[in-house]
């Protein structure tokens, strides 16, 4: 019975997110660090509503993703552009970009990563410190499982290691995505317990960062050379207008309900109906000092005029927001099962304290089309 339940969960999980995909370019990986090429590339072919994570020890030029390079030639003048100008409706949070659900034209852009010899040595040490020496490779695990000679204790051990590894990856991803703003240097969480001599390796050895010094990796004996990492992204277009409200911009028409905040009206309400499985959202008027209430919408929302944790109403939702800036849109992926109808709100507060714009979402009960189609027989 457990096996049937597990398979059903996996099936639903895979089909639930079939419309979006996560991409990552991680230039701290050994294949990039130990490459003998002066340029190393990571190419991403993305669609609207996908997310992209850019992990780089030392970013060059634009910090990605608040601004990105629109030319592969880093020396070209005026080659950077704000992500809101290039892909309106996208959200940047930490080292991750959630691509706008509506992209009008095919859009390429680039991010660059500086990998000098000292930085490379530092991250090789970090990678090797974090690697669990007694951890079996995925191939070894599958070999044991297929052989049928795995005891229950060994199976539990494999499962625990997999869960621990997943937790470590999840915690690290959360740390990267919760960063207040992208910076040139890559920060690492204290929870990894990386020794200070490794964390500060680049500080202690900065004088050795010279092209005339031959450096070899202490483990593989491969020569280490300085190089540039290039993340090349190609985002494909679509024709899906975003279901939601855009306060303060009635010209772009990226959202289904573009609303101008011009004039003397101090309070406007934009009402949207959302069904299970749908992605909905809103964007406040662009103001550097504007704010949203509750501050961590959609994790918290206004329900019956009270601040409420959304997970108590519709567990299983997903939100895409920048916790440190209200200039980006706020998106909510409604879960595929909703028990009952709920009406929730988030408010955009203007610099002028008298101005308030309300996003009101009427969440309908039931099951999503993905779930319903999963149980249909051909």
Curated annotation (Swiss-Prot):
Compartment(s) of residence: Cell surface; Cell membrane
Lineage: superkingdom: Eukaryota
Modification after translation, per record: Processed into a soluble form.
One protein family per Pfam: s48_45
Signal peptide: 1-20
Keyword terms, alphabetized: Cell membrane, Disulfide bond, Glycoprotein, Malaria, Membrane, Repeat, Signal
GO cellular component, one term: cell surface
InterPro entries: 6_CYS_dom (IPR010884), 6_CYS_dom_sf (IPR038160), Parasite_Repro/Invasion_Surf (IPR051444)
Membrane among keywords: yes
Positions glycosylated per UniProt: 77, 149, 182, 205, 351
Disruption phenotype: No visible phenotype. Parasites grow at normal rates in vitro.
Disulfide bonds: 25-42, 56-113, 64-111, 245-270, 284-348, 297-346
The keyword Hydrolase appears for this protein: no
Stretches assigned to the 6-Cys domain: 21-133, 241-375
Additional facts recorded: Does not have erythrocyte-receptor-binding ability.
Complex formation: Heterodimer; heterodimerizes with PF12. May form an antiparallel heterodimer with PF12.
Identification of the protein by name: Merozoite surface protein P41
Source species of the chain: Plasmodium falciparum (isolate 3D7)
Primary gene name: PF41
């Amino acid at each position: 019975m457990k096996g049937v339940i597990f398979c059903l969960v996996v099936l639903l999980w895979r089909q639930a997110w079939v419309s979006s995909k996560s991409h990552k370019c991680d230039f701290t990986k050994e294949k990039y660090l130990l490459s003998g090429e002066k340029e190393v590339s990571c190419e991403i072919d993305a669609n609207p509503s996908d997310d992209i994570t850019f992990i780089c020890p030392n970013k060059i030029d634009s910090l990605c993703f608040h601004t990105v390079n629109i030319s592969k030639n880093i020396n070209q003048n005026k080659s950077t552009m704000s992500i809101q100008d290039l892909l309106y409706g996208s959200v940047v949070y930490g080292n991750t970009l959630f691509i706008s659900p509506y992209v009008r034209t095919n859009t390429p852009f680039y991010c660059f990563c500086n990998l000098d010899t000292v930085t490379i040595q530092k991250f090789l040490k970090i990678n090797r410190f974090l690697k669990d020496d007694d951890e079996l490779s995925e191939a070894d695990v599958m070999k044991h499982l297929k052989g049928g000679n795995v005891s229950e204790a060994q199976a539990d051990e494999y499962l625990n290691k997999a869960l621990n590894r997943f937790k470590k990856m999840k915690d690290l991803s959360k740390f990267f995505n919760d960063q207040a703003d992208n910076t040139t240097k890559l920060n690492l969480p204290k929870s990894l317990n990386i020794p200070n001599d490794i964390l500060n390796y680049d500080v202690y050895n900065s004088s050795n960062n010279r092209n005339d010094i031959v450096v070899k990796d202490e483990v593989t004996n491969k020569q280490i050379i300085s190089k540039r990492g290039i993340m090349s992204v190609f985002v494909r277009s679509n024709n899906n207008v975003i279901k939601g409200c855009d306060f303060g911009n009635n010209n772009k028409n990226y959202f289904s309900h573009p609303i101008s905040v011009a004039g003397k009206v101090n309070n406007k309400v934009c009402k949207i109906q959302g069904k299970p499985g749908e992605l909905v959202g809103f964007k406040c008027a662009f103001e550097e000092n504007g704010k949203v209430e509750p501050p961590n919408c959609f994790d918290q929302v206004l329900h019956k005029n009270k601040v409420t944790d959304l997970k108590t109403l519709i567990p299983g939702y997903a939100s895409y927001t920048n916790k440190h800036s209200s200039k980006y849109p706020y998106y909510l992926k409604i879960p595929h099962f909703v028990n009952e109808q709920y009406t929730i709100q988030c408010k955009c507060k203007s610099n002028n304290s008298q101005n308030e714009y309300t996003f009101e979402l009427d969440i309908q009960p039931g099951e999503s089309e993905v779930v319903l189609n999963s149980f249909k027989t051909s």
